[in-house]
């Protein structure tokens, strides 16, 4: 599995060219993309500037000598490469298994070309088998948890050890065990309208390419060619 993740990440790095501002994703597959960018800077003299999606990726990028800038100092990003936890046939996805969904969506939004790197196990017919992360403010989080519980969403707080995980943005994450999300766009809008929800892990209609690594090799799926 790690070999497939590395293959996807290295393939995505081939889309990066000199002078780009690039979004550096978070997670076990995006990790290999960031590593390959670091290698290309060192060995090929690649000239890029990165925008990171988590404190973990920031630390990795700094260790590799990748020049970084703040999302607040730019107006657009040429290319962002990130992982995904599930991708359906309509190119909607669930992200946030690494608890970085808020920063990931902020970086994805001004991106000209948004690429996901996944292994073939992440391709699904329907989203929802992977628990949907919902980032919520700490104030009122328990009340919101009960709202989700009454709605039948089977919520659970994301934990780190015996304490609730706190995201880079100082929020909690409530994971929803939905089983199957029949209409991701509609459910995303519902969460968007829920007071106390900062962001959710449904990335609907955002991705341009999905690079899939499988036993047979690498496949590049183009969202704009889907029917």
Curated annotation (Swiss-Prot):
Q: Name one GO biological process term.
A: pentose-phosphate shunt, non-oxidative branch
- Signal peptide residues are none
Q: Which UniProt keywords apply?
A: Isomerase
InterPro entries listed in its UniProt record: NagB/RpiA_transferase-like, Ribose-5P_isomerase, Ribose5P_isomerase_typA_subgr, Ribose5P_isomerase_type_A
Write down the chemical reaction(s) this protein catalyses: aldehydo-D-ribose 5-phosphate = D-ribulose 5-phosphate
The entry's substrate-binding residues are: 26-29, 82-85, 95-98, 122
Pathway assigned to this chain's UniProt record:
Carbohydrate degradation; pentose phosphate pathway; D-ribose 5-phosphate from D-ribulose 5-phosphate (non-oxidative stage): step 1/1
PANTHER family under this entry?
RIBOSE-5-PHOSPHATE ISOMERASE 3, CHLOROPLASTIC-RELATED
Role according to the record: Catalyzes the reversible conversion of ribose-5-phosphate to ribulose 5-phosphate.
What subunit structure does UniProt give? Homodimer.
Name under which the protein is recorded: Ribose-5-phosphate isomerase A
């Amino acid at each position: 599995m790690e070999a497939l993740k590395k293959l996807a990440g290295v393939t995505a790095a081939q889309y990066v060219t000199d002078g780009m501002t690039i979004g550096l994703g978070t997670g076990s597959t995006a990790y290999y993309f960031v590593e390959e960018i670091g290698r290309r800077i060192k060995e090929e003299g690649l000239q890029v500037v990165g925008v990171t999606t988590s404190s973990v990726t920031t630390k990795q990028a700094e260790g590799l000598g990748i020049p970084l800038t703040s999302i607040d100092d730019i107006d657009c990003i040429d290319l962002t490469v990130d992982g995904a936890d599930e991708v359906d046939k309509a190119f909607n996805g669930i992200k946030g298994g690494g608890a970085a969904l808020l920063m990931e969506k902020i970086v994805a939004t001004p991106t000209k070309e948004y690429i996901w790197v996944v292994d073939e196990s992440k391709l699904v017919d329907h989203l929802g088998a992977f628990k949907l992360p919902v980032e919520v403010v700490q104030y009122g989080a328990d009340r919101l948890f009960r709202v989700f519980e009454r709605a039948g969403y089977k919520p659970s707080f994301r934990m780190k050890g015996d304490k609730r995980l706190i995201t880079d943005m100082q929020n909690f994450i409530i994971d929803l065990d939905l089983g199957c999300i029949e209409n991701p766009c509609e459910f995303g809008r519902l969460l968007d309208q829920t007071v106390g929800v900062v962001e959710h892990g449904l990335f609907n209609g955002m991705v341009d390419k999905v690079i899939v690594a499988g036993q047979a090799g690498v496949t590049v799926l183009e969202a704009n060619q889907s029917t």
